[in-house]
Amino acid sequence: MYWTFAFFTLLMIAVLLLSRFPQVQHTTEERAGSLEMYRALARKRVVWMYFFAMFAYVGCEQGTADWISQFLSQYHGFDPHTTGATAVSWFWGLLTAGCFLGLLLLKIFDSRKVLIGASFGALFCLSAALFGPASVSVIAFPAIGLFASVMWPIVISLALNSVAEHHGSFSGILSTAIIGGALVPVIIGRVGDRIGLRGGLACLYLTFGCILTIGFWAKPLINNTTLNLKKASAEAAT
């Protein structure tokens, strides 16, 4: 399997080296910007709030995926190489598939409402996974991925839509927040060593809760465009 990945990696490198791409002229908003731009952004409270929100989201994603197999093995006796691995695969699969459902929901509802609903759904699944029986836990863990799938794009869009300038620099700051994916799983493990893995994974209540709050305090400059279903129904009737 690793040889297959290595082959395709080398193939992609070769294609990129042989391809000719047009030269892109970045606008002022798209450029990374000067040190002064970053200082200006660092003085904005909303920038830090979204930075920690992105930190929390990536922590949720990796913190869940990294410990699913161990939890199912430790508390329910599932084989980590079969059932555990399958649960992790389903988590990532639903995390991907849920993006398509998110596209539909964002055409109907305000992005903040979608984020609130997804956060509550993820918290419910987390509770079922941590405290439910084996038959529920093995399903609830992957289901977290379905609800988490819409969080990344919504948080990113709300963040960039909350500042009027320096979007390129702000994007760089948000990208730095992916360090949460490296730190949160370690925190879960450290807490788990002291009070048990269930207690460690309970840290995800804090990170998912952080995402939930965005739906209440976010104030985007422009709201996402949604379909007016009542108007569409009236027009169809006439």
Residue ranges and their predicted role:
Residues 54, 91-97, 178-180:
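Short hydrophobic/small-residue motifs within alpha-helical transmembrane segments
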Residues 97-110, 192-193:
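Helix-to-loop junctions at the C-terminal end of transmembrane segments
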Residues 3-28, 212-219:
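C-terminal membrane-cytosol helix-exit motif in multi-pass small-molecule transporters
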Residues 24-50:
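Juxtamembrane intracellular "pre-TM" segments in multi-pass secondary transporters
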Residues 113-128, 202:
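Structural signature of the two symmetry-related core transmembrane helices
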Residues 41-90:
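Extracytoplasmic gate region of multi-pass secondary transporters
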Residues 149-164:
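Intracellular juxtamembrane helix-capping segments at the cytosolic ends
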Residues 1-6, 187-208:
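A membrane-interface helix-boundary motif in multi-pass transporters
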